[in-house]
């Protein structure tokens, strides 16, 4: 039986710097959703919170159009099909992945969905983490852009986050020396004891710069932070080093982001700094997921989720990504889904 109303969260105002309490607005609207031809009605169960979402709040040119004022906040997630419209290839009870947004229910066209069939050793939620965008970003960023080789030294910033922690693990699997950078002693301990990096460093430590220098120069730097961290790491390059420019989480809330000051080292060390977008590798997702699922199954790659309960908590949870409040993949549990879901 369908509810009489449902909740969704929309963009209320564009933040200049930090996400504020009035950035988003909750709406309770009548339930009048009905799938049309080639569409399905989905009950959202899980939503992914990712640093890229901060960029979607800016009214600026990017790889995706910005979320408009009054629109449901964009987010990827998992859901269960409640009803399939005429001509749909899906069936009620199937679990799907899509860009559902911050809402409890949504009508989505078939072409915008992926059916979730977890391989051995995996579970549906892994498609928001290791088998989803974070895992694929780590996989292709390190393999294609970083071109990491056995015996090389890899530094990873934002190492306790979803992407960073997976980069660390893939770096170890590739036979590299892995130095992880995080923002608390608890995260340092987790990275060394649970993730298995060679050394984890706390960037808030007064000895951080000297601690980095003790680890020698780097072959690959996987950058999730940008700003002062990137400028410092550009002074630590070996000849022919590669910088994988994945994100700049320290800059996303800045009204005037800092520019590069150490870029001349790219010339002197014949180094390369390259940005990338994981969507460009869509034709290779299946092969990457097969690898990652195998490693999940044999335990050589570990998963960690930071779970927030309830859709209404999403606006409060999103800023955690920019203050170091999460360890592992940050997700929102929206609902358990219907009892008939094929879990």
Which residues make up each language-model segment?
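Short acidic-hydrophobic, aromatic-tinged amphipathic segments that line or gate anion-handling sites
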Residues: 199-204, 306-313
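Eukaryotic N-terminal low-complexity, Ser/Thr- and Lys/Arg-rich leader segments
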Residues: 1-34, 89, 336-343
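Glycine-rich NAD(P) Rossmann-fold beta1-alpha1 loop
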Residues: 135-136, 158-168, 226
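NAD(P)H dinucleotide-binding glycine-rich loop of Rossmann-like/cofactor-binding domains
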Residues: 73-80, 89-158
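Glycine-rich phosphate-binding loop and adjacent beta-alpha segment
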Residues: 228-301, 335-343
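C-terminal capping/lid region of NAD(P)-dependent oxidoreductase domains
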Residues: 3-6, 300-307, 315-343
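Adenosine-nucleotide cofactor-binding segment
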Residues: 156, 172-232, 255, 279
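Glycine-rich beta-strand-centered segment in the early N-terminal region that forms part
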Residues: 32-49, 58-102
């Amino acid at each position: 039986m369908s509810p009489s109303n449902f909740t969704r969260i929309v963009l209320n105002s564009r933040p200049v710097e930090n996400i504020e309490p009035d950035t988003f607005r909750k709406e309770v609207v009548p339930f009048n959703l009905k799938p049309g031809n080639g569409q399905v009605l989905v009950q959202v169960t899980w939503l992914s919170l990712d640093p890229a979402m901060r960029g979607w709040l800016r009214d600026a040119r990017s790889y995706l159009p910005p979320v408009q004022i009054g629109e449901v906040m964009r987010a990827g997630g998992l859901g269960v099909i409640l009803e399939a419209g005429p001509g749909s290839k899906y069936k009620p009870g199937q679990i799907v992945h899509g860009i559902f947004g911050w809402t409890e229910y949504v009508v989505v066209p078939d072409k915008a969905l992926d059916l979730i069939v977890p391989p051995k050793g995996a579970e549906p939620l892994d498609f928001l983490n290791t088998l989803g965008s974070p895992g694929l970003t780590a996989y292709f960023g390190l393999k294609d852009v970083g071109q990491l080789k056995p015996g090389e030294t890899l530094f990873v910033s934002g190492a306790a986050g979803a992407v960073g922690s997976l980069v660390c693990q893939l770096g170890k699997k590739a036979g590299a020396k892995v130095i992880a950078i995080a923002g608390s002693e608890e995260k340092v301990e987790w990275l060394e004891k649970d993730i298995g990096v060679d050394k984890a460093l706390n960037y808030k430590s007064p000895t951080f710069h000297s601690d980095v220098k003790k680890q020698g120069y780097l072959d690959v730097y996987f950058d999730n932070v940008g700003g002062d961290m990137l400028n410092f790491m550009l002074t630590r390059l070996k000849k022919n080093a590669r910088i994988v420019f994945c994100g700049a989480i320290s800059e996303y809330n800045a009204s005037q982001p800092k520019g590069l000051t150490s870029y001349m080292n790219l010339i002197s060390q014949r180094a390369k700094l390259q940005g990338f977008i994981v969507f460009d590798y869509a034709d290779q997702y299946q092969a990457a997921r097969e690898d990652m699922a195998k490693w999940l199954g044999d335990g050589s790659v570990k998963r960690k989720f930071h779970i927030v309960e309830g859709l209404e908590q999403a606006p409060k949870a999103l800023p955690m990504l920019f203050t170091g409040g999460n360890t592992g993949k940050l997700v929102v549990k929206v609902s358990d889904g219907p009892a008939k879901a094929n879990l």
